[in-house]
Amino acid sequence: MRIDIISVLPKIIESPFKHSILKRAQEKRLVEIYIHSLREYSTDKHHRVDDYPFGGGSGMVLQCEPIDRAISSLQLQRNYDEIIYTSPDGETFNQQIANDLSICYNLIILCGHYKGIDYRIREHLITREISIGDYVLTGGELAAVVICDTIVRLIPGVINDEQSALSDSFQDNLLAPPIYTRPSNYKGWIVPDILLSGHKAKIKDWELQQSIDRTKRLRPDL
């Protein structure tokens, strides 16, 4: 998989890709992640990429030309499965979307900033708009990191224990069951006996029931 991220402020998101699972996935050559500065595609002598909105109003809008140049430049080199725009208007990101994106070969993620992007880009170039929640961030960079982290860990070989990713919360629209580790008794806080019994079938049934109960209690919307 290859992921190209286009951002006005690329340095904001450089660090997360140099650590943990995202770093290991790149070292294993299971994913390539490139961060592109939108300003590099500006024809303005000051590398300006934004302007005031037509019709008035506050804030600045990212212009068509640099975004079009950035996306077109990448498309000349390869075909992309999706061109994603991180936006509070988009479909809410969830595990199913992550599963779908994890089997793609090439993705572009365009990070919104300021008041957003010229709507013509959304009409003519963007294939999918994704929101990570009903709130507004300063820019779409953090959303891009969330999307990348979520989908990359699903790529076969990224996580050594692939069952770990498949058993995460939301994979089957259920929250994960409670998990515990040693010691079994800490300050009188006791691990449920069933988990110490060694009966795998009973443990599996217990975990499923716990997942159902927790989902009903904490996330009935699921």
UniProtKB/Swiss-Prot annotation:
Keywords: Cytoplasm, Methyltransferase, S-adenosyl-L-methionine, Transferase, tRNA processing. Its main location: cytoplasm. The keyword Transferase applies. Its EC number is 2.1.1.228. One of its GO terms (cellular component) is cytosol. GO terms for biological process: tRNA N1-guanine methylation. Transmembrane segments: none annotated. It is found in: Cytoplasm. S-adenosyl-L-methionine binds at G112, I132, G133, D134, Y135, V136, L137. Pfam families: tRNA_m1G_MT (PF01746). InterPro entries: Alpha/beta_knot_MTases, tRNA_m1G_MeTrfase_C_sf, tRNA_m1G_MeTrfase_TrmD, tRNA_m1G_MTases_N, tRNA_MeTrfase_TRMD/TRM10. It catalyses: guanosine(37) in tRNA + S-adenosyl-L-methionine = N(1)-methylguanosine(37) in tRNA + S-adenosyl-L-homocysteine + H(+). The keyword Methyltransferase applies. GO terms for molecular function: tRNA (guanine(37)-N1)-methyltransferase activity. Belongs to the RNA methyltransferase TrmD family. Homodimer. Specifically methylates guanosine-37 in various tRNAs. This is tRNA (guanine-N(1)-)-methyltransferase. It comes from Azobacteroides pseudotrichonymphae genomovar. CFP2.
